[in-house]
């Protein structure tokens, strides 16, 4: 089982929160103290809380659940995309478009448009158009790919959200709450933990910390899926033996 240790978190700087003056009092239970006017997060709480979240995500994946990684700020964007792809899941790593979950019907139409454009760009349709028309369609396709590329093959709403920075992604969290989709989120000392089902108190700005979270989640998801495949294979063997 994918587990993250106290040492891993210390080395990645997970314990460094935001400046004390920007804190959210709701994060008080997870704060160890203050050093140089910066809040220090209590990793003795973060370690078990993160490992519980990993267990949940692994279980969701084992039940063939879809996990949507959300991290649209610069420090998270690349790590979110890489880890989602590595674990064969889905991601939003640019702007969160309002209604991405709660207005899925409209989003699905945009995804269909993106897929149609992708087919047209490859089957020779674009070659029959004028340069200006081709340029406009390519621009439209790039714009749609940037917004929806990470969810175009999701095929419906996700079963769980994994979020980097609860404050920055509050709209995504609110939409998930409205639909009853469980949320795992990295929550820094300046953020509001309300609406997060699995709170992981930790630094949400340091690239090393973000990579630690996303890699651990990708590993947990992959292990969950592999365990299901192994169990299914053993079940099939057992049936054959009978």
Swiss-Prot record:
Question: What PROSITE patterns does this protein's entry cite?
Answer: RIBOSOMAL_S2_1 (PS00962), RIBOSOMAL_S2_2 (PS00963)
Q: Does the keyword rRNA processing apply?
A: no
- Listed SUPFAM superfamilies: Ribosomal protein S2 (SSF52313)
A Gene Ontology biological process noted in the UniProt record is:
translation
Q: Which family does it belong to?
A: Belongs to the universal ribosomal protein uS2 family.
> Superkingdom of this entry's organism?
Bacteria
Q: Does the keyword Repressor apply?
A: no
Provide the Gene Ontology terms for cellular component: cytosolic small ribosomal subunit
Q: Which InterPro entries does the annotation name?
A: Ribosomal_uS2, Ribosomal_uS2_bac/mit/plastid, Ribosomal_uS2_CS, Ribosomal_uS2_flav_dom_sf
Tell me the keywords, alphabetical order. Ribonucleoprotein, Ribosomal protein
Provide a Gene Ontology MF annotation, just one: structural constituent of ribosome
- Protein name stated in the entry: Small ribosomal subunit protein uS2
């Amino acid at each position: 089982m994918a587990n993250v240790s106290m040492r891993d978190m210390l080395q990645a700087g997970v314990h460094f929160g935001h400046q004390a003056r920007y804190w959210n009092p709701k994060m008080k239970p997870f704060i160890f103290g203050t050093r140089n006017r910066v809040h220090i997060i209590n990793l003795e709480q973060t370690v078990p809380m993160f490992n519980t979240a990993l267990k949940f995500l692994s279980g969701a994946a084992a039940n063939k659940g879809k996990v949507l990684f959300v991290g649209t700020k610069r420090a998270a964007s690349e790590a979110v995309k890489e880890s989602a792809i590595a674990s064969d899941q889905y991601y939003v790593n640019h702007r969160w478009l309002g209604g991405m979950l709660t207005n899925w019907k409209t989003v699905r139409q945009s995804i269909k448009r993106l897929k149609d454009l992708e087919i047209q760009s490859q089957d020779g349709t674009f070659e029959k158009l004028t340069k200006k028309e081709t340029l406009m369609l390519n621009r439209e396709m790039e714009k749609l790919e940037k917004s929806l590329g990470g969810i175009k093959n999701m095929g419906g709403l996700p079963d769980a959200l994994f979020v980097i920075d609860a404050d920055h992604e509050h709209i995504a969290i609110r939409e998930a709450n409205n639909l009853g989709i469980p949320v795992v989120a990295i929550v820094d000392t300046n953020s509001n933990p309300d609406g997060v089902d699995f709170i992981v108190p930790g630094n949400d700005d340091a690239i090393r910390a973000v990579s630690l979270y996303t890699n651990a989640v990708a590993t947990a998801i992959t292990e969950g899926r592999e365990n299901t495949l192994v169990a299914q294979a053993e079940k099939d063997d057992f049936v054959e033996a009978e």
